[in-house]
């Protein structure tokens, strides 16, 4: 029995050893290295055998259920969690067990952090899988870190002690100027060949871009004047309760911009009739038609089953499907009448396929990505539905081929030019040109245009892109075909761009007040003056200088605008009645605060204001109430997408202070739009290194005049030899005039970039400042950064999760006085479970008693500091 028990115990222990993790295998190897002399543990084996015999009879045929092994033999096995889970601040652990897990709460032990300032870990390894999926380069090379400007204190260390303070300040200012000049030149050389940079500053590209922008602006102006002449603006008010009429007007403007005719505008009336002709039992689909750019009634019936599947997934689509949630009412009735609705759908699709050709394919493409995921339990139903959908698709296609024959001599059907399908590309590398994307997407039918956003310096000048297609295409099929295509080692990874959910959005209803409306008329007129002059929209010729602001504008909507800016007062009546000062209250003060007034609405002023705001929105793509300009809107999928209007009337009375505060805040927001594009003065440009074209040409000629020997000179551009340098110079100007022109254009290219006060640049990296005496910051947060829950993901150090929000984690508040070390022992590098203990309240404030079970470092240095002593911080 002894030998069999030996084997029994060994097998039991080996079984549990095999289930242990790598953390315990080193101990297993150590034990086996010492040999399998189990007689040394006879005391333990005997004790366990006796304990089994005392409590029950031993039976070999009976399956034993063993409790976990004893603690002195191995760590307890009932929990798959290590000791540092409970004691995350234990300094004895090496910190290298889980390098992929993050330790929160503060600085960590372990390998040193990457180069550079801790605020600049952009696109680090922990976000690579996500970024690679979204279309960025698979392996991102951060390259050489950009140089950081020295602080004045660091600069003083490089100077001799004999330099006095005035000279040191002067030298430091010269150093800063040289540093910025060098940074600017390096940036120019790094990006001069990229399309976005050349289109902004190169003289040839700038001219083309201005001409295209001017042509698009004049087209929008013609559309606005056409709509105004046909009476589209006569009874239109920019109030939230007129949202349907506003959307209809925006759609009409888009149809006109796309080259549509009055006949094409009839489709807006047809859509409205179809919406009103819906069944009374069904929920109203007018709002849905607004939000999704007006889907037809026949389209909805055709895809009735798709809507039923979508109802179960509405919770995932918060922002895009607000209006569709109404469909969930009466799902039971829809399910009971499923077969009838399918038959009606087929009939309606046959009747309306001439008006809505290709709508079925759009419906499949316009649903959100989350709705495209299929469930395994519905495989058979989906297969049947797919077959039916294919049959329904084939019928419209057959009739589409017959349609041109029938309509050859008949009236043309109105085209839905205001509806489009589009793809969104999140990350487009700066070295990819628009022409490359256009040539790639032109292969697919229905392609219309490409829009690219401005490059983002914080994302390595990557851009976002939108590719617009005709409404009749199957956008999901095109998206799938483009999914794995790479351009210049960059994955495009397109996604289907959803339709706008709320095209009309409202702001505070206080904007209906008469005083605010009059102020808005003044600001809107000033904006129109500024934008018209900047774009030279009303100039007779492109070369004509803009009209001075003192002269009346040729813009017809500004005619007699001053009549509405003059406020009429009853001064004589007040004098006769004996009013000493200020206008008398229009009505006796009611109960409550007498300083409060009712919102007074003047319909005449509002009508004048709305015409100005529509001019800004349609012609200049400026949303007045949102105080922003929509750039490149002509290239976007929606050429007139969103507009902000006045909200409902405030239910309560308003104070005079609220009116003044609103006006002041609104004018501050509009200031950037009113300001003229800034450029450097001549003096500042010279300091920054402005280049002279003549000097640069001389440098070019000198560098291409090489002396080979006595009376022997070479022109390296052509390889010809001459007897003197003057002959080489004459040869270059005569035979290489295009090279001279290139030099002059390059100088103008650089000077255009230099004189732009808002020129793009790398994000400035500021050295870390020591915390001030009253500065309290969460761990891992540096001055100038937002709080952890607002910090961009790319700005977090490598391998660490976001630090706890202020007041909720370990060391959430640092001591006000800087000490020699951290307030608490640091969490080890890669603390398990994301340092969950930090969120359980261990150490919410300095001085809180620590958990007695947590082992502290016995070698911790006891430090004494005079709290009354001034901080050892130098200020310059």
Curated annotation (Swiss-Prot):
It comes from Homo sapiens. The keyword Acyltransferase does not apply. This is Serrate RNA effector molecule homolog. One of its GO terms (biological process) is positive regulation of neurogenesis. Keywords: Acetylation, Activator, Cytoplasm, Isopeptide bond, Methylation, Nucleus, Phosphoprotein, RNA-mediated gene silencing, Transcription, Transcription regulation, Ubl conjugation. It comes from the Eukaryota. The keyword Electron transport does not apply. Acts as a mediator between the cap-binding complex (CBC) and the primary microRNAs (miRNAs) processing machinery during cell proliferation. Contributes to the stability and delivery of capped primary miRNA transcripts to the primary miRNA processing complex containing DGCR8 and DROSHA, thereby playing a role in RNA-mediated gene silencing (RNAi) by miRNAs. Binds capped RNAs (m7GpppG-capped RNA); however interaction is probably mediated via its interaction with NCBP1/CBP80 component of the CBC complex. Involved in cell cycle progression at S phase. The modification Phosphotyrosine is found at residue 8. Ubiquitously expressed. One of its GO terms (molecular function) is RNA binding. Its main location: nucleus. The modification Phosphoserine is found at residues 4, 67, 74, 136, 493, 540, 570, 679. The modification Phosphothreonine is found at residues 544, 671. Interacts with NCBP1 and DROSHA. Interacts with CASP8AP2 and ERBB4. Interacts with LUZP4. Interacts with NCBP2/CBP20 and NCBP3. Interacts with MTREX. The gene is SRRT. Residues 8-73, 297-347, 388-412 have a biased composition (Basic and acidic residues).
């Amino acid at each position: 029995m002894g030998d069999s028990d030996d084997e029994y115990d060994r097998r039991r222990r080996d079984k549990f050893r095999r289930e242990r993790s790598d953390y315990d295998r080193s101990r297993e190897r150590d034990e086996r290295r010492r040999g399998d002399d189990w007689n040394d543990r006879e005391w333990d084996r005997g004790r366990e055998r006796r304990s089994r015999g005392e409590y029950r009879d031993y039976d070999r045929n009976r399956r034993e259920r063993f409790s976990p092994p004893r603690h002195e033999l191995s760590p307890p096995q009932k929990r798959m969690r290590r000791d540092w889970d409970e004691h995350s601040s234990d300094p004895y652990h090496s910190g290298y067990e889980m390098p992929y897990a993050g330790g929160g709460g503060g600085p960590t032990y372990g390998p040193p952090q990457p180069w550079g300032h801790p605020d600049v870990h952009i696109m680090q390894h922990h976000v690579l899988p996500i970024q690679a999926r979204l279309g960025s380069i698979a392996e991102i090379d951060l390259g050489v870190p950009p140089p950081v400007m020295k602080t004045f204190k660091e600069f003083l260390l490089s100077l001799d002690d004999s330099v006095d303070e005035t000279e040191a300040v002067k030298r430091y200012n010269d150093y800063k100027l040289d540093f910025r000049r060098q940074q600017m030149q390096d940036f120019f050389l790094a990006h001069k060949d990229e399309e976005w940079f050349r289109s902004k500053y190169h003289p040839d590209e700038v001219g083309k871009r201005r001409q295209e922008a001017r042509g698009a602006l004049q087209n929008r102006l013609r559309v606005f004047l056409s709509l105004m002449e046909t009476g589209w603006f006569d009874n239109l008010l920019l109030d939230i309760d007129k949202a349907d009429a506003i959307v209809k007007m925006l759609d009409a403007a888009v149809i006109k911009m796309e080259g549509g005719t009055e006949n094409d505008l009839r489709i807006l009336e047809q859509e409205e009739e179809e919406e009103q002709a819906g069944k009374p039992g069904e929920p109203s689909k007018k709002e849905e038609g607004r939000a999704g750019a007006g889907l037809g009634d026949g389209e909805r019936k055709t895809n009735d089953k798709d809507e039923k599947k979508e109802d179960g997934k509405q919770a995932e689509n918060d922002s895009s499907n607000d209006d569709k949630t109404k469909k969930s009412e009466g799902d039971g009735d829809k399910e009971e009448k499923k077969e009838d609705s399918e038959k009606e759908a087929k009939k309606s699709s046959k009747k309306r396929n001439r008006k809505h050709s290709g709508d079925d394919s759009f419906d499949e493409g316009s649903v959100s990505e989350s709705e495209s995921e299929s469930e395994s339990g519905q495989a058979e139903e989906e297969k049947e539905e797919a077959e039916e959908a294919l049959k329904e698709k084939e019928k419209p296609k057959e009739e589409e081929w017959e349609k041109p024959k029938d309509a050859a001599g008949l009236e043309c059907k109105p085209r839905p030019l205001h509806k489009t399908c589009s793809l969104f590309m999140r990350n487009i590398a700066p070295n990819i040109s628009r022409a490359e994307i256009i040539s790639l997407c032109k292969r697919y039918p229905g392609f219309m245009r490409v829009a690219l956003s401005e490059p983002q310096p914080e994302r390595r000048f990557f851009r976002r892109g939108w590719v617009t297609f005709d409404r009749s295409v199957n956008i999901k099929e095109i998206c799938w075909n483009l999914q794995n295509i790479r351009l210049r080692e960059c994955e495009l990874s397109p996604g289907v761009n959803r339709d706008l959910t709320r095209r009309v959005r409202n702001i505070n209803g206080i904007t209906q007040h008469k005083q605010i409306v009059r102020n808005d008329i003044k600001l809107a007129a000033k904006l129109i003056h500024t934008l018209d002059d900047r774009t030279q929209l009303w100039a007779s010729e492109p070369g004509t200088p803009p009209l001075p602001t003192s002269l009346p504008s040729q813009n017809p909507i500004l005619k007699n605008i001053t009549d509405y800016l003059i406020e009429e007062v009853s001064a004589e009546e007040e004098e006769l009645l004996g009013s000493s000062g200020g206008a008398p209250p229009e009505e006796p003060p009611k109960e409550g605060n007498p300083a409060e007034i009712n919102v007074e609405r003047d319909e005449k002023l509002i009508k004048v204001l709305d015409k100005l705001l529509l001019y800004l929105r349609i012609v200049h793509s400026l949303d007045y109430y949102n105080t922003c300009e929509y750039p490149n809107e002509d290239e976007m999928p929606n050429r007139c997408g969103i507009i902000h209007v006045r909200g409902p009337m405030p239910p309560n009375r308003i104070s005079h202070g609220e009116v003044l505060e609103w006006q002041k805040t609104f004018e501050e927001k509009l200031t950037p739009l009113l300001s003229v594009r800034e450029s450097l003065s001549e003096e500042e440009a010279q300091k920054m290194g402005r280049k002279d074209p003549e000097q640069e040409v001389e440098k070019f000629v000198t560098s291409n005049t090489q002396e080979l020997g006595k009376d022997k000179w070479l022109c390296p551009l052509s390889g010809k030899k001459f007897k003197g340098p003057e002959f080489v110079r004459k040869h270059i100007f005569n035979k290489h005039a295009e090279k001279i022109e290139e030099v002059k254009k390059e100088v103008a290219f650089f000077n255009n970039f230099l004189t732009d006060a808002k020129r793009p640049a790398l994000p400035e990296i500021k050295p870390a400042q020591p915390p001030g005496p009253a500065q309290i910051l969460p761990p891992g947060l540096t001055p100038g950064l937002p709080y952890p829950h607002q910090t961009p993901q790319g700005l977090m150090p490598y391998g660490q999760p976001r630090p706890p929000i202020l007041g909720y984690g370990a060391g959430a508040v640092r001591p006000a006085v800087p000490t020699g070390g951290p307030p608490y022992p640091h969490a080890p590098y890669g603390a398990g479970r994301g340092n969950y203990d930090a969120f359980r309240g261990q150490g919410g404030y300095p001085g809180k008693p620590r958990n007695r079970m947590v082992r502290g470092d016995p070698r911790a240095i006891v430090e004494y500091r005079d709290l009354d002593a001034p901080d050892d911080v130098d200020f310059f």
